[in-house]
Amino acid sequence: MFVSGEAIKFGGLDPKNAKVIVCHLGNGASVSAVKYGESVDTSMGLTPLEGLIMGTRSGDLDPAIISFLAEKEGMTASQVIDVCNKKSGVLGLSDGYSSDFRDLVQASETGNEQAKHALEAYAYRVGKYIGAYAAAMNGVDVIAFTAGVGENNAEVRAMIGEYIGYLGTNIDAERNKVRGEEIILSDEGSKVVTMVVPTNEELAIARKSAAIAEAGTDTYGNTFAK
């Protein structure tokens, strides 16, 4: 909610009417849909394994993969889950080359086809979730990139941008060169604003703690003296 709130302020929007998609893209990653100030969906499920392709996590898979690999490879369910968590994602798709997106971009630019494939699959999955959440909210006003990859990897942002142009946003190539700074990436003709919003988890925790202290009650209804 921190990033969506900052995106709304940066874009000069009314939080009661804004529809925001937050792409938290790091070694772990998720996409969230925030409608009128309330989170309505997120790509992660019971565990972080659901959703996007990540550094070492597979993201969405047919649950039958567990029984399939158990029978085919003689693996236990725990071993399959371990592979999905620690040996999959872009690491697996790049044939073990790297889970670091900087390495993958560099390798892709020098002709490593597996690294290129891993990045393309990653961007496709992010683009698919953005489209799904735009549909879920019946529109989107802002798409915000955040976290290590989202804030700093211009190449990955550009690849994702190729999948979301139909929404009415066009990422400006020059603006997209900026790394680690709050900036609007989309050009003036875009109907949907695409931006980078640096995350600040410490500030978010501090703000929430201050609000709880001021209210004298926490999220679960527990009260305490101010």
Q: What are the functions of these language-model segments?
A:
Residues 17-23, 78-87, 142-144:
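Beta-strand segments within the central parallel beta-sheet cores of soluble alpha/beta enzyme folds
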Residues 1-72:
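Glycine-rich phosphate-binding loop of actin/hexokinase-like ATP-binding domains
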Residues 116, 120-141, 150-224:
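Internal helix-turn-beta structural module
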Residues 73-118:
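A mobile "lid/hinge" subdomain adjacent to the ATP/sugar-phosphate binding pocket shared
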Residues 2-10, 65-69, 79, 83, ...:
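Alpha-helical scaffold segments in soluble metabolic enzymes
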Residues 27-28, 36-39, 98, 150-151, ...:
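Short, glycine-/Ser/Thr-/acidic-enriched flexible segments
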Residues 2, 29, 60-64, 75, ...:
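Conserved active-site and cofactor/substrate-binding residues in soluble primary-metabolism enzymes
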